[in-house]
Swiss-Prot record:
GO terms for molecular function: rRNA binding; structural constituent of ribosome. This protein binds to the 23S rRNA, and is important in its secondary structure. It is located near the subunit interface in the base of the L7/L12 stalk, and near the tRNA binding site of the peptidyltransferase center. GO terms for cellular component: cytosolic large ribosomal subunit. It comes from Campylobacter fetus subsp. fetus (strain 82-40). Part of the 50S ribosomal subunit. This is Large ribosomal subunit protein uL6. Belongs to the universal ribosomal protein uL6 family. Keywords: Ribonucleoprotein, Ribosomal protein, RNA-binding, rRNA-binding. NCBIfam families: L6_bact. Pfam families: Ribosomal_L6.
Length: 178
């Protein structure tokens, strides 16, 4: 039995949720998101809650039950508060600058890296901290992973781009034989 799927999602004020067949439609202001469940779960929208129930008792149905509940909750949280990821740049001469919809990175290569931001993502840079904001959890995480992937932190000096909460396990350098 899905412990996540059993929990109803409360609909906050200002968020309109409607059900069109097997598609949940979330609206807040001029922002609209759709979640297609492909008919794998039963959905009810009543009394300010979204309630998910499993279509069957097989393993696949129970997996969909918890998954779609979590995806719907991510849409609700994204439209109300949004998601944020922070990246930290460490290294001599490593810099970042936000220029409109492009993130310009100088990470020790012979050329600057210009990363074009996807739709719905905002970015801000303060000193060596890059803050990525957006309403879609998957896209925010994907952008953060791609930016980190340009120069992942190395274990000897810790230089590179890392998540703000990430801890780098350091290695000792070579020791000389005498």
């Amino acid at each position: 039995m899905s412990r996540i799927g059993k929990q109803p999602i409360s609909i906050p004020n200002g968020l309109d949720v409607s059900l069109k067949g097997s598609v949940l439609v979330f609206k807040k202001g001029n922002n609209t998101k759709e979640l297609d469940t492909k008919g794998n779960v039963n959905i009810e929208v009543k009394d300010g809650n979204i309630i998910f129930t499993s279509k069957g008792d097989d393993r696949q149905s129970r997996a969909y039950w918890g998954t779609y509940r979590a995806l719907a909750n991510n849409v609700v949280v994204g439209l109300t508060t949004g998601f944020t990821k922070q990246l930290e740049i460490n290294g001599v001469g490593y810099k970042a600058a936000a220029k409109g919809k492009v993130l310009e990175l100088a990470l020790g290569f012979s050329h600057p890296i210009n990363y074009e931001l996807p739709e719905g993502i905002e970015i801000s840079v303060e000193k060596n901290i890059i803050t990525i904001k957006g309403s879609d959890k998957q896209v925010v995480g994907q952008v953060a992973a791609e930016v980190r992937g340009f120069r992942p932190p190395e274990p000897y000096k810790g230089k590179g781009v890392k998540y703000a909460e990430e801890r780098i396990i350091r290695k000792a350098g070579k020791t000389s034989k005498k």
